[in-house]
Amino acid sequence: MKRIIPFGREFGSGGRELGRRIAEKLEIAYYDQEIITEIAKRTALSEEYVRRIEEKRPVMHFPIHTGHSIYLISEPTFYPDFSIYTKQHELLRELSRKSDCVIVGRCADYILREQKPVRIFAYADMESRIKRCMERRPEDEHLTEAQMKKRIAEIDRSRAKYYAFFSEQKWGARENYDLLVNTSGADIKKLSSALCAYLEAMFE
């Protein structure tokens, strides 16, 4: 049985680190930044541009979702963004066929739903998320806790809109995942070990 683990996460929940540690412990592939790099190559766009666009809802005026046909559009001002989404969906399917893997975000739980993945979503209380983000912010970034809280909320809204647009489902809703993990105050390293035991049981 192919071990495909899409990993959704609230911003600042530690979901990215948790997914990476799980991949390391299970000795399977881990995809996050690597997806941005590959999409940039395939679209001839900069990695920075892809990073800004990839988990934001497309600016389009007609419905598109992965469960139905994806229509190409002729309007050149829309094409670069749209190309990112179509290439990303293609790449996620390629990666999942290639090997067992953890894929962070990018609506992978929905896009790869036919492969029967074990879908995980990490969340945490706002206090824990602010603390984590403040501890990991770049040295030249001087946001206050109030400003960080605002950024967290903005990123979460963006991810929720992206997810709803492509899946027509609610981001973070328990019915869309196999396991929801509250990382508030948790030791991510220890938590990853517990989750690996769960995953091994699920994939038997």
Annotate each PLM feature.
Residues 6-20:
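Glycine-rich phosphate-binding P-loop
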Residues 29-40:
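Short beta-strand-centered segment that lines the nucleotide-binding/catalytic pocket of NTP-utilizing
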Residues 40-100:
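ATP-dependent small-molecule kinase phosphotransfer cores
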Residues 60-65, 142-188:
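Small-molecule kinase domains that catalyze NTP-dependent phosphoryl transfer to phosphate-bearing small molecules
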Residues 89, 188-196:
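Short, amphipathic alpha-helical "lid/cap" segments that border enzyme active or binding sites
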Residues 95, 105-120:
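RNA pseudouridine synthases
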Residues 114-134, 143-155:
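Conserved phosphate-donor/acceptor-positioning beta-strand/loop module used by diverse small-molecule
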